[in-house]
Swiss-Prot record:
This is NADPH-dependent diflavin oxidoreductase 1. The keyword Nucleotidyltransferase does not apply. PANTHER family: NADPH-DEPENDENT DIFLAVIN OXIDOREDUCTASE 1, NITRIC OXIDE SYNTHASE-RELATED. The gene is tah18. FAD binds at residues 343, 373-376, 407-410, 584. Keywords: Cytoplasm, FAD, Flavoprotein, FMN, Mitochondrion, NADP, Oxidoreductase. Residues 6-150 form the Flavodoxin-like domain. One of its GO terms (molecular function) is NADPH-hemoprotein reductase activity. InterPro entries: CysJ-like_FAD-binding (IPR003097), FAD-bd_FR_type (IPR017927), Flavdoxin-like (IPR001094), Flavodoxin/NO_synth (IPR008254), Flavoprot_Pyr_Nucl_cyt_Rdtase (IPR001709), Flavoprotein-like_sf (IPR029039), FNR_nucleotide-bd (IPR039261), NADPH_Cyt_P450_Rdtase_alpha (IPR023173). NADPH-dependent reductase which is a central component of the cytosolic iron-sulfur (Fe-S) protein assembly (CIA) machinery. Transfers electrons from NADPH via its FAD and FMN prosthetic groups to the [2Fe-2S] cluster of dre2, another key component of the CIA machinery. In turn, this reduced cluster provides electrons for assembly of cytosolic iron-sulfur cluster proteins. Positively controls H(2)O(2)-induced cell death. Interacts with dre2; as part of the cytosolic iron-sulfur (Fe-S) protein assembly (CIA) machinery.
Length: 584
């Protein structure tokens, strides 16, 4: 039976690909197409047996890996038993969200496109490659790509119904109704202490929340420790996922902006109006207050889709026109100047556009949901203690706006008291080094990039592997030398060689790549003579490429080869899984 829907399937790690998928869903729905949007792993694989049109939008994570919510789908496509005619009835398009500062730029979308072709699927529109380094970001490239997609799609598929007007309000994707059978204010619904925050699968209790950067340092870095069940397991390189929630003051301000005070504690029943559309996670007690507190991301930067939605619910002509301008790609620079560059939040936007009052029925269409935040686990798994540790640099900075900018998870961690219990998740990382082998391991981890390296060092020491080198970098020895006592202990025991670069402790700035160059002969011998491994962890700015430049230079200097051959040496390490880079 022919499938009349267009499927928009995404693989998203940080929410970018998912946001683009939602935007395309609204655009195609407005054009009159029947559209379904889901993560690839939530897609019903039986649909692949029918003729269908699919648009795939995916990001790349790790070293060219697939995002978590498309791995099941990807594993299915990789089955060797699938014939090369399996997807003969599929017409598809692929858009990748990437960053050219990474070596394997848009690797996931390229691999997906190639595999779909191998299985017989036909591309009806050229593959798009979004780039965070583009002047207009991924969204700018996506908007251009979509215009081409629309014309190509029109050639193969006729809309199912008349198109909506440019400024017509689309029907809500979710049905949100007040459960009148329980009354508007049921006893207990206003008591938020009994809410079970069970979004993750693993019960955790915070036992330690301590600042480990100097109180005088500009950045607050926290060492968090959680007590979790002893049977839980993780490996070096794995990540913990924290699910923050909004503070009560912000929640009440948001509810006041929306005019929802009269239904603040009203119990809700929520279902999907769109076939195969998965509902987000909800707390066990679902009322308006808890929907805003635990589900809606009111401190995120508003998307263009938000402005388009908000324009429908303003009775102020000037506000409506301005909101519509922000929603249009034609005014993308104005949108960036108002939102992205100053990092203005959804709540702050609503406080400025006071005429906007979005009805509760459109809450899940207008506002993004809170996403889990991933942090590298900073200690080895010891089931005798059941303790999981993280090192988290809290995000707080100033823009042109009066109030400091603060990430939702950073805001949450600041107010998180010890003995608070909630659920978390542990996800597998992508570390493909043979770290349990008796080979030297050279590690580079400036700042909180040292967190996964701490777990790795502890694991190797536990297994009796002593040839560990750590190049650590920070601003000042007295300000942000993270886990200093641990490194002192390991060096005294002879299980670690430590090289530090304190960039601001001398007149000329010194970074990790300079420390690597100063110890070039040692690094070269470990890599070339002893088949050593190399692990870079930390910021995705200039550091990773500077480290790679340093290694290439060292190889050239001590082997007598050209600098080009030095880079080829690094590439060969990557291919042999001896050079790993985990940056964010």
């Amino acid at each position: 039976m022919k499938n009349s829907h267009i499927y928009i399937l995404y693989g998203s790690e940080t929410g970018t690909a998912e946001g683009l998928a939602e935007s395309l869903f609204r655009s195609l729905t407005r054009m009159g197409y029947d559209v379904l949007v889901n993560s690839m792993d939530d897609f019903n694989l039986e649909n692949l047996l029918r003729p269908l049109q699919c648009v795939f939008i995916c990001s790349t994570t790790g070293q060219g890996e697939m995002p978590l919510n498309m791995r099941k789908f990807w594993r299915f496509l990789l089955r060797k038993k699938l014939p090369n005619t399996f997807l003969n009835d599929m017409q598809y398009a692929v858009f990748g969200c990437g960053d050219t500062s990474y070596t394997r730029f848009n690797w996931a979308s390229k691999k997906l496109d190639s595999r779909l072709r191998q299985l017989g699927a036909q591309s009806f529109s050229s593959r798009g490659e979004g780039d965070e380094q583009h002047p207009d970001g991924v969204e700018g490239v996506f908007a251009y790509w979509c215009n081409h997609l629309y014309s190509q799609l029109a050639a193969i598929k006729t809309p199912s119904r008349p198109a909506f007007g440019e400024f017509d309000l689309l029907p809500p994707s979710f049905q949100i109704i007040i459960d009148e059978s329980l009354g508007c204010k049921v006893k207990g619904f206003e008591d938020n202490n009994i809410v079970r925050h069970s979004r993750g699968k693993i019960e955790a209790t915070l036992v330690h929340n301590k600042r480990i950067s100097n109180i005088k340092h500009w950045q607050d870095v926290r060492h968090l420790a959680f007590k979790i069940p002893n049977f839980e397991r993780w490996k070096p390189g794995d990540v913990a996922v924290l699910y923050p929630w909004n503070d009560d003051m912000s929640v009440n301000s948001f509810i006041e902006c929306m005019g929802w005070e009269s239904i603040k504690y009203s119990p809700l029943i929520i279902s999907s109006n769109v076939a195969e559309r998965k509902l987000p996670w909800f707390p066990n007690i679902l009322n308006v207050f808890n929907l805003v507190k635990y589900v809606l991301s009111i401190h995120s930067v508003p998307s263009r889709t938000f402005f388009e939605m908000a324009s429908h619910f303003s009775n102020n002509k000037m506000h409506k026109e301005r909101l519509q301008e922000f929603s249009s790609y034609k005014n993308i620079d104005d949108y960036y100047d108002y939102t992205t560059r100053p990092r203005r939040t959804v709540l702050e936007t609503l406080q400025e556009f006071k005429s906007v009052q979005i009805p509760i029925e459109y809450a899940l269409d207008a506002f993004p949901v809170i996403r889990g935040r991933q942090y590298s686990i900073a200690n080895r798994c010891d089931n005798s203690t059941g303790i999981l540790e993280l090192a988290v640099a809290l995000v707080k900075y100033q823009t042109i706006l009066k109030s400091p900018r603060q990430g939702i998870c950073s805001r949450w961690i600041c107010d998180l008291h010890e003995n608070t219990s909630f659920n978390i998740d542990i996800l597998p990382g992508f570390l493909n080094l043979s770290y349990q082998s008796n080979k030297p391991l050279i590690m580079v981890g400036p700042g909180t990039g040292v967190a996964p390296l701490r777990a790795l060092i502890q694991e190797r020491i536990y297994n009796g592997l002593k040839e560990n080198l750590l190049f650590f970098g920070c601003r000042n020895k007295s300000m942000d030398f993270l886990f200093e006592k641990d490194w002192e202990k390991y060096t005294e025991e002879g299980t670690l060689k430590l090289f530090c670069a304190f960039s601001r402790d001398q007149e000329k700035k010194k970074y990790v790549q300079h420390s690597i160059q100063e110890n070039g002969e040692l690094v070269y011998n470990l890599l070339n003579e002893k088949d050593g491994m190399f692990f870079v962890s930390g910021s995705s700015g200039k550091m990773p490429s500077s480290v790679k430049d340093a290694i290439a230079g060292i190889v050239s200097k001590y082997s007598g080869c050209s600098i080009s051959d030095g880079y080829s040496f690094v590439t060969s390490l990557e291919k042999k899984n001896r050079y790993y880079q985990e940056t964010w």
